């Protein structure tokens, strides 16, 4: 997030954390001072209206997420993947981390933060746990733009098939984990 684009530079600072996305996101959450935590990927871009929606939602109950769109830095079919992410989010209630998770700190802590024992899919695991604990998943109905360069660099079909396989295999694993960790 280019915080200066939104007048947020006074509240933005750089920090270093050990390798691993879960560790890094948890370190960011620990260092944050607000009542809400907002997790964005480094290549995320948000229009001003999306930032406004996030600021309006911050502090509300639930796990908020945005509608994924891809930048024009990848192949045209990547737009189909963005449509698929929207369907997955709305129909299966499975938004992923590239959709910019926003939730109250107390909710994040109650969910146990991102699971640092996982080698990947920590965002997926958090969503399954939120669902198991009846935390509402809230579509903020605003776009978030991410790079499609992986589809360009690694091939659209190969990347799409790998993501589909990961989604299914992680869903089986994380849904069972979430049931075990829920009251």
Where are these regions (language model features)?
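Conserved donor NDP-sugar-binding/catalytic core segment of glycosyltransferases
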Residues: 48-77
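Short aromatic/hydrophobic "clamp" motif used to bind/position activated sugar donors
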Residues: 37
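Hydrophobic helical membrane-anchoring modules
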Residues: 128-183
């Amino acid at each position: 997030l280019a915080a200066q684009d939104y007048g947020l530079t006074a509240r933005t600072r750089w920090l270093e954390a050990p390798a691993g996305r879960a560790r890094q996101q948890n370190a960011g959450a620990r260092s944050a001072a607000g009542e809400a935590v907002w997790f964005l990927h480094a290549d995320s871009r948000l229009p001003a209206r999306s930032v406004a929606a996030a600021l309006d939602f911050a502090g509300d109950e639930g796990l908020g997420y945005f509608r994924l769109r891809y930048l024009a830095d990848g192949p045209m079919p990547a737009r189909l993947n963005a449509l698929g992410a929207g369907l997955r989010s709305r129909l299966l209630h499975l938004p992923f981390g590239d959709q910019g998770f926003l939730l109250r700190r107390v909710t994040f802590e109650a969910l146990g933060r991102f699971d640092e024992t996982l080698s990947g899919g920590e965002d997926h695991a958090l969503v399954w746990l939120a669902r198991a604990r009846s935390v509402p998943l809230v579509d903020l109905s605003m776009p978030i733009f991410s790079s499609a360069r992986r589809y360009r660099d690694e091939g659209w079909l190969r990347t799409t098939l790998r993501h589909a396989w990961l989604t299914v295999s992680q869903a089986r694993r994380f849904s069972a984990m979430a049931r075990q960790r829920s009251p």
